[in-house]
Amino acid sequence: MSQQLQSRRLRQPIVVVLGHVDHGKTTLLDKIRGTAVVKKEPGEMTQEVGASFVPTSVIEKIAEPLKKTFPIKLEIPGLLFIDTPGHELFSNLRRRGGSVADIAILVVDVVEGFQKQTYESLEILRSRKVPFLVAANKIDRIPGWKPIDTYSFLESIKSQRKDVQTQLDNYVYRLVGQLAELGFNADRFDRIRDFTKTVAIVPVSAKTGEGIAELLALLAGLTQNYMKTKLRFAEGPAKGVILEVKELQGLGYTIDVIIYDGILKKNDTIIIGGLNGPIVTKVRSILVPKPLQDIKVVKTDLTQIDEVYAAAGVKIYAPELENALAGSPLFVAENEQQIEEYKKIIQEEIASVKYYNANIAGIVVKADSLGSLEAIVEGLKQKNIPIRLADIGPITKKDITEAELTLQEAKEYGIIAAFRVKPLQGIEVPNNIKLIYSEIIYQLIDDIEKYITEVRESEKRRTLDSLILPGKFRLIPGYVFRRSDPVIVGVEVLGGIIRPKFPVMKKDGKRVGEILQIQDNKKSVDRATKGMEVAVSIKGNIMVGRQIDEGEILYTDVPKEDLEILLTKYKDIITDDMKEVIKEIINIKRVNDPTYALGLKV
């Protein structure tokens, strides 16, 4: 082991794969793993939990055709790919001030371009300060593309027709433009001079394998050249992060961990985050899958090892892991002082993600891990959605109480957002609280946003239905169908809106009655707006020719409270013509009430 360690100057970089749904993340990972298994020598690939290791010797074999293009002597042992692509697991690869991941592949369907989750993935990578390159996937879908039996894109592109090459260029330049809008310089990898300033776009086909050679060569070369300090191997106690907490039949609770620094040994004392605070326990077993010959074999058979060094994915069995927190750091402590130091660090980590403020009318968020909670809270903050409580674990009675308190203040935020957690046994979320459950982070945030909008729109409709809104109309001469009790006349709406039950006043502010019914082409309608000519019945102690006259202009009699609500809460529905009517109504009303609409901006 020590000889092995002496030769290990650099550890393998940790690679994650992100991107939009159906853009080929899993297919690309499968292709990389499958290709590596085909190219390996017996005993060359170590087995990992939650990750796949591709050794340098395999990268060199796959990238053989690129020797002249990329004349790099690889010093890293290989690349460690996190097996599960996407936001959910990546959010658990958290580390104070960033991520455990060293580099990311952002997978984009070259034909479709950037989609919603592509932008979200980029936002996460930017916030966690993770460098990335773009895999412009599905080049085989470009009309006229002829798949070539090679892992090299540069070899394959030479064999494509000129028009196909031009079409690919157009797709790539669209990606360059989309990245530029977000503040990233980007270009096709073979046109880049300075990789520190430009994001590399690698055209690939996860289906045929074309471009895999360049992708692996770039990942290895870039990490080795620009991250030497970060990748320097340290022969000290291990540091890691918990990817997942799992219960294994016959064994009990285990944690899947990515070790990113140092060495983990059997019987080491580890400190991890737990639901109720830091957990101090001893490693009973370090487990990895038995060696595979075929990548399709499921990694279920586990074998014990005595020690493991970074970077690696392992399963740890130890006592008291049932409350372990995914997304929490893992530290190996060598003495009491270190135990206390790490307990404090973990306590602070958990506290920095959890949140409670009784003074905020906001939603309640519950998640299954530290990483997912952090990602959801970040996403909600970007959408300006207030949070009252953010915590880890199942939904409790306290969560329901907090949501009910919010409901009293702001109906749209009476939400419990649950990410992969359910209510505790015996606890039911009442119908007046909206329970939004999802197993996908972006979906949860979308559903929360959608519900808030729906409630606001419904409240808006309800409020607007109860308000008397500004309207102005003229009695059309020659269209008097009934002179009194009720008056039925033809009118032209000059501005704003009129509706049944709206009170009506003259230009001098005197109320003359209330609109009973509106008809358009002999059909009852619930409103009439500018430009419409309709028949209106008005109930009141009035007669045409006495209190009101043909050709006269009338207004809706808007109470000051209703106008205040309209101008402060629903300004977005005020049209230009309604704005003019409001000004006229204010002038009419202020003759008798100087405080009418005082301090309100039209």
Curated annotation (Swiss-Prot):
Residues 10-227 form the tr-type G domain. Gene3D superfamilies: P-loop containing nucleotide triphosphate hydrolases (3.40.50.300), Translation factors (2.40.30.10), Translation initiation factor IF- 2, domain 3 (3.40.50.10050). Pfam families: GTP_EFTU, GTP_EFTU_D2, GTP_EFTU_D4, IF-2. Keywords: GTP-binding, Initiation factor, Nucleotide-binding, Protein biosynthesis. One of its GO terms (cellular component) is cytoplasm. One of its GO terms (molecular function) is GTP binding. Residues 137-140 are annotated as: G4. Residues 83-86 are annotated as: G3. SUPFAM superfamilies: Initiation factor IF2/eIF5b, domain 3, P-loop containing nucleoside triphosphate hydrolases, Translation proteins. GTP binds at residues 19-26, 83-87, 137-140. Residues 19-26 are annotated as: G1. Residues 205-207 are annotated as: G5. The keyword Ribosomal protein does not apply. The keyword GTP-binding applies. Function in general translation initiation by promoting the binding of the formylmethionine-tRNA to ribosomes. Seems to function along with eIF-2. Belongs to the TRAFAC class translation factor GTPase superfamily. Classic translation factor GTPase family. IF-2 subfamily. NCBIfam families: aIF-2, PRK04004.1, small_GTP. This is Probable translation initiation factor IF-2. It comes from Sulfurisphaera tokodaii (strain DSM 16993 / JCM 10545 / NBRC 100140 / 7) (Sulfolobus tokodaii).
